[in-house]
Amino acid sequence: MAPNHTNTLMDALVVLQTRRSPSVFGARADIFRNPKAAAALRFLRILPMTRERDGLHSVVDNYKTFDEIDSVLEHGVPFCMFPEGRHRAERGLLPIQKGIARIAFRSAAERQTYVVPTGITYGDFFLYRSTCDGVFGKPIDVNAFLREREELPEAKKYAQFRELLSERILELVDMSPKVKRLSFWWILLFPLWIAAALLSLPIWLSAELLCSRGIKDKAFGNSVRLLFKLFLTPILLLVWALVLCLTLPWWLSLPLLILFLFSYSLFYDGLYWLHDRRA
């Protein structure tokens, strides 16, 4: 699978959510430098991919990863990589790098291989809980592609494959997505939104402080917000359960605890609605 890359970790989650089946992903190799991070990433089925700008000595390490990718494909598990080699929070597509062609051609020498162009379009790149569309295009038959170009030099095969893949991905990316406006009923639910904001305040405030002060690349913001939700929600749930059960009757504390489970998402949905009304 070959999606465009605009929203860091969120792009991989979109692919997983759309397919709902196991996949292995490629990610830039520099995030594997920490041994603990590398172990965690490999546990999540993410493999390191070096880029030309990382230096030729680093690119050699890709051949080790290629062997792992071969093993993944041999077992019938899809491999997903972002062929641009980096992310950009803009509509469109950066130049396709050589890595996707190297992997596809190498795999085609051993088995029937397809590359699936994938388009990901966000309603807003920086708003958490914004809309998103993921579209899978017609697979490119790599074996047929190579048979039709047997007489061409390798460099031309690479160039034509990258050009074809770029065209196929761009066909799937909506360059002017329609804003999906939320219902005006949100005004009536304003008190509920306030309650959700207060219940989840330690999570979203921590996330927003880190996003505003500690992250230079805003494209990582939504990934950070998601990670804060995943790691802090269980902790805060225990805290609220203790506080509410000691201070309120059960018939009031139970609904508040249930509301807390959805409060983080409700808070950001409300922010999205406010942004949407101003747009």
PLM-predicted stretches and their roles:
Residues 183-202:
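Transmembrane alpha-helical segments and their cytosolic interface motifs
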